[in-house]
Amino acid sequence: MKKRVITFTLLSCMSLLFIQGKTNCKYEKKIADYNYIIGTQTIGAKYKFTNETNLVETAKAIRAMGSNLLKMSMSPRYFWENYDIPKNESICSLTDLAKEKNMKQVFDLDFKYYQIWAYEFSQYVVEPEGQKKDENQIQFINGLSDYDSIRCYREIYDLAAHLLKTYSGTGKVFMLGNWEGDWHLRWDYDRTKPANPKTIEGMTRWLRVRQKAVDDAKKIIPHKNVSLFYYVEVNLSDLALDGKECVINSILPNLNPDYVSFSSYTATNPPRSETEMEKTLTTHLNYIESKMKPKSGIEGKRLFIGEYGWPELGFYSNEPSYRSPEEINKRAKWVIKTAVKWGCPFVLWWEMYNNELTNDGKNRGFWLINDKGEKTPLYNTHKEFYLESKVFLREYVKRNKKMPSESEFRSAAIKFKSLN
């Protein structure tokens, strides 16, 4: 009898441990996949430290920092401006590029979230050797033709279909979008003159076509446990607040994208204190959101910060000649806390490795790891934030046997030691 009781007790304990283990595993997966809001990106890195392509090296560095989000670029410039991936003449579309071994390698890494600048090969006009012309990436200046509209739709649809089929069952979240839309609308970079009405019309059509291609792929392609969204990026919010023509005022109200990205330099560069940052950035975020139509099926706010940042070395007349890494870290914390409090689903620093050079060839210092391989204070802020977040989530689960609400996480996050 005693032996039977001991055996029963042992089996009961083992069963309890098994159940607890299953419970812990369930929550650990949710913790690994959690949206930690803050992150970074890798586009156009000017240096590297391994024999891998700069895309793969920087993606691994971002993952090693603790981020489960990767922002990157896919375009016909993959081999010279964006990355040092070897040129391959057989790559003629975004889907071809998605199958390229370096691209596939980063898609196979254990990132949960991917944000991708997606520019169609079918819309691209090759630049003269050694020249970069952003207008060559688009065909909607003075209007988008039916021919280019059809080609645009087909290429984005095919990429969307490929991602849904290839990564079905992985739980990954893909977001396709564009770089700073106002510099497509004003492709000559002249913000002083009115936007061309025909270009406004053409850009509106381009963005609608891309959203429809994503929507149609999601309806038609069988898939499970993989998500795909489309976003539009805006940037000249100061013009918007002045009532001038820009993507926010002239195009966004006529669209209904899944998400909107704000490349936020016009809001985040001027403030000189945390109080001023919170007031200014909140004003800009509120204004942009006021131009967005509501959309069912997506929880939470749909406006995020796709870029913010400051280089160590100044270049333009409206910026200091030098900012210390400590000053940059302090300012970044202002942005993060304001955006987290406001409800931005993502807040992305520009960027992991620097991409801009001074006239004499020096790295300007848009980085979390510098050109000597040194990690900046802001790198450590990100790393520590991820660690604190996981501690908070595990302790919350232990107490409550469930994950926290988004608002509970945000309320806790702005008080983390890493941000204060």
Annotate each predicted stretch with a short phrase:
Residues 1-26:
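Bacterial Sec-dependent N-terminal signal peptides
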Residues 26-79:
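Boundary/entry segment of secreted carbohydrate-active catalytic domains
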Residues 50-52, 81-115, 130-139, 319-323, ...:
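Aromatic-rich peripheral "rim/lid" segments of glycoside hydrolase catalytic domains that contact
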Residues 53-58, 94-104, 236-251, 282-292, ...:
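Alpha-helical scaffolding within the catalytic cores
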Residues 57-199, 221-228, 267:
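Substrate-binding cleft and catalytic face of glycoside hydrolase catalytic domains
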Residues 173-179, 204-244, 298-311, 347-352:
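Aromatic-lined carbohydrate-recognition surfaces of secreted/lumenal glycan-active proteins
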Residues 183-192, 264, 294-332, 349-368:
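Active-site clefts of carbohydrate-active enzymes
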Residues 250, 254-317:
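Glycoside hydrolase catalytic-domain groove-lining segments
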